[in-house]
Curated annotation (Swiss-Prot):
CDD domains: Ribosomal_L1
Protein name, as recorded: Large ribosomal subunit protein uL1
SUPFAM superfamilies, sorted: Ribosomal protein L1
Entry-linked PROSITE patterns: RIBOSOMAL_L1 (PS01199)
Protein species of origin: Halobacterium salinarum (strain ATCC 700922 / JCM 11081 / NRC-1) (Halobacterium halobium)
Length: 212
């Protein structure tokens, strides 16, 4: 359970959000400090599974053949085989469109080298190289887990944003998501909470509310 300060900040952000004719996301903005973000080892870049879900559809594409492809077809948004990979390698525009439309990629481990060669220049800079699927991994479990995953990534910027829910989720559920993200962040930053300058939560069009 998240602490009351987080839940109160989320409740204020939801209450202060103007009414719109579309479903707004709820986002977290984190401001870092005392880190050399020119050093890749000090940057934030990892996936976090949200206990209450992301509140939105997460687009997942699987690179696979055979039985894995058949099983992935039931849960992934698209399943691509070696022939599809070859086509994408010859069509940079299509590869870029796919990368921009997809949140996460998963690939059978034997395909990773071919994917790196064919799509590395497209997926790499976007931070979207596939998660390797090992022989003992269940593709259905992996995809379902990633549907509730967000990527927290600072790159070389002091401030980064991540989705933590949607406006029709409860403040408690959104706060639980934020709590998991902050705990992971504190555990991985060099100085823990001391490397976090401030944290804000807001809906897409609403005002930012500081999380104490």
């Amino acid at each position: 359970m998240a602490d009351n300060d987080i839940e109160e900040a989320v409740a204020r952000a939801l209450e202060d959000a103007p009414q719109r004719n579309f479903r707004e996301t709820v986002d977290l903005a984190v401001n870092l400090r005392d880190l050399d973000l020119n050093d890749p080892s000090q940057r934030v870049d990892e996936g976090v599974v949200l206990p209450s879900g992301t509140g939105q559809e997460t687009q997942i594409v699987v690179f696979a053949d055979g039985e894995t492809a058949v099983r992935a077809d039931d849960v992934a948004d698209d399943v691509l085989d070696e022939d599809d990979l070859s086509d994408l390698a010859d069509d940079t525009d299509a590869a870029k469109d796919l990368a921009d439309e997809t949140d996460f990629f998963v690939a059978e481990a034997p395909m990773m080298q071919d994917i790196a060669g064919a799509l590395g220049q497209v997926l790499g800079p976007r931070g979207k190289m596939p998660t390797p699927l090992q022989p003992d991994d269940d593709v259905v479990d992996t995809v379902n887990r990633m549907k509730n995953t967000v990527q927290i990534r600072s790159r070389d910027r002091r401030t980064f944003h991540t989705r933590v829910g949607a406006e029709d989720m409860s403040a408690e559920d959104i706060a639980s998501n934020i709590d998991v993200i902050m705990r992971r962040l504190h555990a991985n930053l060099e100085k823990g909470p001391l490397n976090v300058d401030s944290v804000y939560v807001k809906t897409t069009m609403g005002p930012a509310v500081e999380v104490a």
